[in-house]
């Protein structure tokens, strides 16, 4: 992460104000099968969910430390809303209007990319399907 945001080989590669950290579709099952990862989690008394939260918060801290605004997928909010900084921008893609309302009411800013209407690999849809999205 340090290389991507500044001070490393990739410095300047992502020069914008915002940095999307991802955080969706994380499969933590493999963490339970790797001995050194299991030992690391046990030493910190973390479950796989806790380790995921630890990692997410470390990444968000690094992004903020470089003066950037962090964007994270909706799953980060879903699993870690109590621990992530309120200045994290949540990128909503799975949810509906109710999810949007909850995220905003919890004090987060939101980018809406509802997959039902904005998942562009659905090339069989016509332009009016996308244009008529009224989340």
What are these regions (language model features)?
Residues 1-88, 93-109:
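Active-site neighborhood of glycoside hydrolase catalytic domains
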Residues 98-135:
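Aromatic-lined glycan-binding groove of carbohydrate-active enzymes
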């Amino acid at each position: 992460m340090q290389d991507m945001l500044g001070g490393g080989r990739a410095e300047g590669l992502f020069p914008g104000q915002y940095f999307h950290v991802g955080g969706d579709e994380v499969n933590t099952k493999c963490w339970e099968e790797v001995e050194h990862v299991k030992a690391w989690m046990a030493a910190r008394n973390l479950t796989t969910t806790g380790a995921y939260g630890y990692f997410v918060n470390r990444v968000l801290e690094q992004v903020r430390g470089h003066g950037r605004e962090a964007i994270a997928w909706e799953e980060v909010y879903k699993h870690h809303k109590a621990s992530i900084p309120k200045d994290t921008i949540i990128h909503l893609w799975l949810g509906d209007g109710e999810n949007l309302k909850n995220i905003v009411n919890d004090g987060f800013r939101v980018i809406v990319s509802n997959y039902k209407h904005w998942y562009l690999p659905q090339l069989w849809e016509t332009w009016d399907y996308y244009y008529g999205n009224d989340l």
